[in-house]
């Protein structure tokens, strides 16, 4: 097959040339070993035309083409050295015995780096980053010249900027940027001046002092928890109980001048108070009298009296004193003359309470009169 193709090529070339050309043209068959290929298949197609023409692979050749010898390690994949399937260095080096005319440029081995398909630079060095612009430091003389021009105009034209730039030995772009920043600073100062009085009034205005709320006044139910500093201490002497003055209460129907009372009157008032309290069925009768005697002028005789329920019992003279002050503060003083003769002034507490109960049981008609 190869011999027939070689002969056909020679005959075509000899017929196309003249006899003089045929003498000069000495066509000899080319051995496959010199081309770097063996005689075993597969084989490539060859173009029978001009010998200086570069070989073309079979997949780019029109159908019916002739076979051409070409190294197999470059045929199936033109960029075999960068093919990730084979890896780096897995393929043999290209055959250097082929003449340069038979090495097609698209089949030239490309020595690429490992990341050349992703990076634009084949040397593996990243492009230099954009350097940060250096800040310009103005001297005092430069600032004086710029401030002088700014006082004349805030928007200098290109000619004025160039003139000033030459004077202070700076580029014109730096002068332009300085004017831009200076205008922004001026606007900021104007805004602060406009908002200055308002902001100063709001920030420097003293905070209103917190009003100290007075302590809550004790209610009438809480009155037993407080003590009166004007209340004289109790003394178990009959002279004090008989001569103790009484404070007129604003709740009494008529203010009556205090009068000295004897022990008999005190006993009568005590019995009257106990009977009246039994008729009204008010608990804690005796502490009510003591509660009024301490100076708490209140019309409520039975409210909040548990405070005095744990107090020790006082002698008879103190009971007489508390009973007298309680009766003088209320309208019940008018009932003292209507009662029967009282018991002895120094009667014990137990006997007095039993006598009170007896008096309350023996005189039902008096109860209705007191109401």
Swiss-Prot record:
Signal sequence, start to end: none
Gene3D superfamilies cross-referenced by the UniProt entry: Homeodomain-like (1.10.10.60)
Name of the protein: Homeobox protein OTX
Chief location of this protein within or outside the cell: nucleus
GO biological process, one term: regulation of transcription by RNA polymerase II
Segments of skewed composition (Low complexity): 188-206, 224-249
GO molecular function (one): RNA polymerase II cis-regulatory region sequence-specific DNA binding
Described function: May play a role in activation of the SPEC2A gene, binds to the TAATCC motif with high specificity. May have additional functions in the developing embryos.
A Pfam family recorded for this sequence: Homeodomain
Highest rank taxon of the organism: Eukaryota
Name of the gene: OTX
Entry's family note: Belongs to the paired homeobox family. Bicoid subfamily.
Subcellular location: Nucleus
Source species of the chain: Strongylocentrotus purpuratus (Purple sea urchin)
Compositionally biased spans, kind Basic and acidic residues: 8-34
Keywords assigned: Developmental protein, DNA-binding, Homeobox, Nucleus
Region Disordered, residue ranges: 1-63, 182-269
Complex and partners: Binds DNA as a monomer.
GO cellular component, one term: nucleus
Cross-referenced SMART domains: HOX
Disulfide bridge map: none
SUPFAM superfamilies in UniProt: Homeodomain-like (SSF46689)
Residue range(s) of DNA binding per entry: 131-190
């Amino acid at each position: 097959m190869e011999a027939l193709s070689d002969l056909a090529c020679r005959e075509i070339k000899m017929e196309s040339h003249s006899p003089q050309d045929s003498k000069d043209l000495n066509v000899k068959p080319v051995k496959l070993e010199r081309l770097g290929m063996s005689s075993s298949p597969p084989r490539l197609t060859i173009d029978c035309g001009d010998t200086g023409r570069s070989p073309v692979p079979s997949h780019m050749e029109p159908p019916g083409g002739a076979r051409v010898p070409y190294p197999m390690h470059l045929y199936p994949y033109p960029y075999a050295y960068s093919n990730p399937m084979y890896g780096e260095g897995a393929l043999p080096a290209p055959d250097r015995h082929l003449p340069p005319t038979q090495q097609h440029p698209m089949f030239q081995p490309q020595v690429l780096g490992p990341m050349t398909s992703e990076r634009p630079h084949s040397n593996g060095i990243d492009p230099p980053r954009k350097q940060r612009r250096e800040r310009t430091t103005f001297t005092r003389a430069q600032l004086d010249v710029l401030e002088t021009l700014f006082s004349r105009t805030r928007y200098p034209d290109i000619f004025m900027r160039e003139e000033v730039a030459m004077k202070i030995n700076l580029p014109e772009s730096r002068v332009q940027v300085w004017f831009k920043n200076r205008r922004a600073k001026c606007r900021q100062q104007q805004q602060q001046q406009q908002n200055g009085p308002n902001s100063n009034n709001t920030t420097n205005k003293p905070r209103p002092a917190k009003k100290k709320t007075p302590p809550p006044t004790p209610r009438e139910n809480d009155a037993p928890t407080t003590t009166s500093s004007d209340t004289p201490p109790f003394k178990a002497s009959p002279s004090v109980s008989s001569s103790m003055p009484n404070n007129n209460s604003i709740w009494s129907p008529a203010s009556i001048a205090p009068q000295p009372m004897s022990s008999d009157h005190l006993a009568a008032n005590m019995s009257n108070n106990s009977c009246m309290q039994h008729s009204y069925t008010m608990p804690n009768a005796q502490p009510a009298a003591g509660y009024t005697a301490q100076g708490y002028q209140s019309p409520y005789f039975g409210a909040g009296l548990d405070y005095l329920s744990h107090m020790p019992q006082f002698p008879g003279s103190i009971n007489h004193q508390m009973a007298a002050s309680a009766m003088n503060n209320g309208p019940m003083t008018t009932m003292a003359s209507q009662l029967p003769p009282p018991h002895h002034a120094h009667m014990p507490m137990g006997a007095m309470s039993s006598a009170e109960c007896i008096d309350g049981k023996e005189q039902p008609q008096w109860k209705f009169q007191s109401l």
